[in-house]
C-alpha cells in the first residue's frame, strides 16, 4: 500500500524560534523527522515549509521540499496547499507527520496509513492509553473517547470520560478508559480538499483543537491504539534539552 508523508515545518515559533532548525546531536530537528519518515516505507516524503533556510537544510539531506505560504492558520491548510501544488489524486493516502517529532517511531507512521487504507473514511489517527492521573487531568494532553467501532465521539482537553465514582474517592488513580490523542493524521487527499472549505466550528475555537471541525460537520475519524508510544515532542527549550539527552 503506497502513501505519501507530508511534514509541515513552520519556521516561526513563539516558544522556540527557528524550531525546525534547532540542533539535535549534530543535525537539524527537521532532518531527524525526515529520517524517521524514510524508515516508514512511504512512497514519497515532502517537507512543507515557508522558510528558505529550512528548505536548504532538507535539500542538503536529500529531501524534497514544497515551499508554502507563511500565512496559513493551521498545519492542515499547509497540507492542502501541497496537495494542490502536487496535484495528488483524491484517493491518495497522505500522512501528516509533525515537524517537531524527531523521535516518532516509523511503525506508527505506517500504522496510521494502513489504518486509513483499510476503511472507507476520510481521516484516521492514533491514541495511547493513559495510566496516571497527572496526564488525565493535564489540559495539554488531549483526550479522545471512541464508539464501539473505534471512531471518535469527541476530543477534549478536559478529562473525558469523567469517572464519577472513582474521582469522587480522590484523584490519585485512573481506570483503563482513558486515551491520549497523538498528533499524527492520515487523510485521503480529497478529504483535505473538502476540509479546508469548511468554516471553523465553535467547538474548535473553544478547545483549540482543529480536528473537532471534522466531527462538527458529521464526518468520522477512525482512532487506533498506537503500536508504539512516541518519544518526546519539542515545543519548548526544556523539551529540546530532554530530547537531546534521550537521543544521545
From Swiss-Prot:
Single GO BP term: CMP-keto-3-deoxy-D-manno-octulosonic acid biosynthetic process
Location in or out of the cell: Cytoplasm
Keywords, sorted A to Z: Cytoplasm, Lipopolysaccharide biosynthesis, Nucleotidyltransferase, Transferase
InterPro entries associated with the record: Cytidylyl_trans, KdsB, Nucleotide-diphossugar_trans
Protein name as it appears in the record: 3-deoxy-manno-octulosonate cytidylyltransferase
Family: Belongs to the KdsB family.
Enzyme Commission number(s) from the entry: 2.7.7.38
Cleaved signal peptide residues: none
GO CC terms, sorted: cytosol
Listed Gene3D superfamilies: Spore Coat Polysaccharide Biosynthesis Protein SpsA, Chain A (3.90.550.10)
Pfam families: CTP_transf_3
GO molecular function, one term: 3-deoxy-manno-octulosonate cytidylyltransferase activity
Catalysed conversion reaction: 3-deoxy-alpha-D-manno-oct-2-ulosonate + CTP = CMP-3-deoxy-beta-D-manno-octulosonate + diphosphate
Keyword Transferase: yes
Membrane-spanning segments: none
NCBIfam families: kdsB, PRK05450.1-3, PRK05450.1-5, PRK13368.1
Organism ancestry: Bacteria, Pseudomonadati, Pseudomonadota, Gammaproteobacteria, Enterobacterales
Enzyme class name: transferase
Principal location: cytoplasm
Keyword Flavoprotein attached: no
UniProt pathway: Nucleotide-sugar biosynthesis; CMP-3-deoxy-D-manno-octulosonate biosynthesis; CMP-3-deoxy-D-manno-octulosonate from 3-deoxy-D-manno-octulosonate and CTP: step 1/1; Bacterial outer membrane biogenesis; lipopolysaccharide biosynthesis
Free-text function comment from the UniProt entry: Activates KDO (a required 8-carbon sugar) for incorporation into bacterial lipopolysaccharide in Gram-negative bacteria.
Top-level taxonomic group: Bacteria
Amino acid at each position: 500500500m503506497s502513501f505519501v508523508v507530508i511534514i509541515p515545518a513552520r519556521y516561526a515559533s513563539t516558544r522556540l524560534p527557528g524550531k525546525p532548525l534547532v540542533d539535535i546531536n549534530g543535525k537539524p530537528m527537521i532532518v531527524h523527522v525526515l529520517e524517521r519518515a524514510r524508515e516508514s516505507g512511504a512512497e514519497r516524503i515532502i517537507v512543507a515549509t515557508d522558510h528558505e533556510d529550512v528548505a536548504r537544510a532538507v535539500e542538503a539531506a536529500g529531501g524534497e521540499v514544497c515551499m508554502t505560504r507563511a500565512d496559513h492558520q493551521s498545519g492542515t491548510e499547509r497540507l492542502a496547499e501541497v496537495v494542490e501544488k502536487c496535484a495528488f489524486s483524491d484517493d491518495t493516502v497522505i500522512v501528516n507527520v509533525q515537524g517537531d517529532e524527531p523521535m516518532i517511531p516509523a511503525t506508527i507512521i505506517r500504522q496510521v496509513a494502513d489504518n486509513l487504507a483499510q476503511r472507507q473514511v476520510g481521516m484516521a489517527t492514533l491514541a495511547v492509553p493513559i495510566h496516571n492521573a497527572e496526564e488525565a487531568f493535564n489540559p495539554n494532553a488531549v483526550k479522545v473517547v471512541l464508539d464501539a467501532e473505534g471512531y471518535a465521539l469527541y476530543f477534549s482537553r478536559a478529562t473525558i470520560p469523567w469517572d464519577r465514582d472513582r474521582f469522587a474517592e480522590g484523584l490519585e488513580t485512573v481506570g483503563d478508559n482513558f486515551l491520549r490523542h497523538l498528533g499524527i493524521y492520515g487523510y485521503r487527499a480529497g478529504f483535505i480538499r473538502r476540509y479546508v472549505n469548511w468554516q471553523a466550528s465553535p467547538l474548535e475555537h473553544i478547545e483549540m483543537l482543529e480536528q473537532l471541525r471534522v466531527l462538527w460537520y458529521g464526518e468520522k475519524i477512525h482512532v487506533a491504539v498506537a503500536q508504539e508510544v512516541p518519544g518526546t515532542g519539542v515545543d519548548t527549550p526544556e523539551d529540546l534539552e530532554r530530547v537531546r539527552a534521550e537521543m544521545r
